[in-house]
Design a protein with these regions (language model features):
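Cyclophilin-like peptidyl-prolyl cis-trans isomerases
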Residues: 4-210
Length: 210
């Protein structure tokens, strides 16, 4: 069983995903996006966000934060994530991995780093991508191609984090970074598995536009 883990010594994020591939998967509304979908395509509900400004409000048991979606850099990733938000996929899930000074990680319906939505998409990030504090990105298995994503995401909680440009960029935190930082303290620094010291629930995610 593959798990989505952020291994500190190797700086690797893992998450289970896989399946057949299909090109020309349009988002809802007849978009012109050309997104490759692997896995169960019937579970994919990609929402074409176009060029407008869109963000996701994350309401947690420890407070709220908001991040803008990187629609230009990652059109397929953001379209997939928006579709998951729209159907309430994340509501009630937890931040199952918290590594102080590194990341908080959530979006796994299994709650142990092995789950996902049943499909994945790909947006290979730019070669000069830097995973700075407040950046939100998607996790993948060590063997998946760069930019592969399902539903598991992470938020970088500290500057100076060194990761290769392999993880699809989802967006940047614009509000509530203090909440992210507080959540980021609820882990054991000596535990690379990132087992939280306190349960943190994603009560609800909401897609916002404009």
């Amino acid at each position: 069983m593959k798990r989505l883990l952020l291994l500190l010594p190797l700086a690797v994020l893992l998450v289970g995903c896989g399946g057949s591939k299909s090109d020309n998967q349009n988002a809802s509304g007849g978009s012109s996006m050309n997104c490759e979908i692997s896995g169960d395509k019937s579970k994919a509900n990609l929402i074409d966000l176009g060029n407008g400004k869109h963000s996701v409000a994350v309401k947690t048991s420890k407070g709220d934060f908001t991040f803008d979606l990187a629609t230009k850099t990652s059109p397929c990733t953001t379209a997939s994530f928006a579709g998951l938000v729209d159907k309430g996929f994340f509501d009630g899930l937890t931040f199952h991995r918290i590594v102080p000074g590194f990341v908080i990680q959530g979006g796994d319906p299994e709650g142990n780093g092995s789950g996902g939505p049943g499909y994945s998409v790909v947006d290979k990030p730019p070669a000069d991508t830097q995973y700075k504090k407040g950046l939100v990105a998607m996790a993948k298995t060590q063997t998946d191609p760069p930019g592969t994503s399902g539903s598991q995401f992470f938020v970088v909680t500290s500057d100076g984090v060194s990761l290769p440009p392999d993880y699809a960029v989802l967006g940047d935190v614009t509000k509530g970074m203090d909440v992210v930082e507080e959540i980021g303290k609820l882990g054991n620094p000596s535990d690379p598995a990132g087992t939280p010291t306190e349960k943190v629930t994603i009560d609800k995610m909401e897609l916002e536009s404009g």
